[in-house]
Amino acid sequence: MDAIKKKMQAMKIEKDNALDRADAAEEKVRQITEKLERVEEELRDTQKKMTQTGDDLDKAQEDLSAATSKLEEKEKTVQEAEAEVASLNRRMTLLEEELERAEERLKIATEKLEEATHNVDESERVRKVMENRSLQDEERANTVEAQLKEAQLLAEEADRKYDEVARKLAMVEADLERAEERAEAGENKIVELEEELRVVGNNLKSLEVSEEKALQREDSYEEQIRTVSSRLKEAETRAEFAERSVQKLQKEVDRLEDELVHEKERYKTISEELDSTFQELSGY
């Protein structure tokens, strides 16, 4: 009987222990269930976050693609601006060379103008000399005429001096003839000089017209250079603006890349937490 009682007591103790173990097991199951529910809730939240992260990643990739397209467009704009600047530089070089040639032609025209002016001055001097000579010849002719009259008076007054007067008269007539010839030659020379002066004047007018045209072309070249300089400045401004835009886009791309790396790290961390939770559940 004692053995039965002891056995019953032992069984009761074992029953109590079993009940305690059962309660403990139920509590542990409840805790595990709650933890599992929390894990499932966290898993659902994580899945939502992953979905949102995927959407954000897609959006980031779309933004990156758009930024890349904009960057390519800006690079194309900068290349076009640089090409335009190079073209303008070549054109400006050609204009400078043409301006140098125009200045050289203007210099030659100026030298010719100075030479023509010198020739006109020389012609004027020669003309004045010939006029003075003509006046001298006329004065000599007047003197000869006076001498002739005096000789005629002397001839009328004194026949005995007729031969001497006749000889003097012949000499005077010869001098008069030579004077008339010189006067005629002087007049012809004056006509020639006047014609030469007219030709020189026409050449001078032609040179003045050429100089005026050269000045007009020079003004046109200067205006073209100012226009090219203005366009060059605008192109430089456009290039600087494009460069600043490229820098801003590059910063935006760098920021998106950093965000992408950060999201990948978050995804990796969440995956590691899920793996750890599943391992803990498997251990129970």
UniProtKB/Swiss-Prot annotation:
Q: What is the effect of changing residue 222 to K?
A: In lev-11-rg1; disrupts most steps of male mating behavior except spicule insertion
User: What tissues contain this protein?
Assistant: Isoform a and isoform d are expressed in body wall muscles, vulva, anus muscles and male tail muscles. Located to the myofibrils of thin actin filaments.
Alphabetic keyword roster: Actin-binding, Coiled coil, Cytoplasm, Muscle protein
Primary site of residence: cytoplasm
**A molecular-function term among this protein's GO annotations:** actin filament binding
Per its UniProt record, what Gene3D superfamilies does this chain match? 1.20.5.170, 1.20.5.340
Query: Pfam families per the record?
Result: Tropomyosin
In the UniProt record, does the keyword Glycosyltransferase occur? no
Q: In its UniProt record, which GO terms are filed under biological process?
A: actin filament organization; locomotion; muscle contraction; negative regulation of actin filament depolymerization; regulation of actin filament polymerization; regulation of muscle contraction; spicule insertion
Null allele phenotype: Worms have 50-75% embryonic lethality. Those that survive body wall interference have abnormal body morphology and uncoordinated movements, and those that survive pharynx interference have deformed pharynges and gut regions. RNAi-mediated knockdown results in a wavy appearance of the actin filaments in adult body wall muscles.
Q: What segment(s) does the record annotate as region Disordered?
A: 40-78
Phenotype for residue 139 to K = In lev-11-sy558; induces spicule protraction (Prc phenotype). Prc phenotype is suppressible by food deprivation
Q: Coiled-coil ranges per the record?
A: 1-284
Enumerate the subcellular locations listed in this protein's record, separating them with semicolons: Cytoplasm; Cytoplasm, Myofibril, Sarcomere, I band
- Assigned GO CC terms: actin filament; cytoplasm; I band; striated muscle thin filament
Q: Sorted alphabetically, which InterPro entries does this protein's record hold?
A: Tropomyosin
Family membership noted in the UniProt record: Belongs to the tropomyosin family.
What is the role of the protein in this entry? Tropomyosin, in association with the troponin complex, plays a central role in the calcium dependent regulation of muscle contraction. Involved in muscle actin filament organization and muscle arm extension and morphology. Protects actin filaments from depolymerization by unc-60 in vitro. Also has a role in male mating behavior by regulating the copulatory spicules. Binds to F-actin.
User: Domain comment text?
Assistant: The molecule is in a coiled coil structure that is formed by 2 polypeptide chains. The sequence exhibits a prominent seven-residues periodicity.
Entry protein name? Tropomyosin isoforms a/b/d/f
Organism ancestry: Eukaryota, Metazoa, Ecdysozoa, Nematoda, Chromadorea
Gene that this polypeptide is encoded by: lev-11
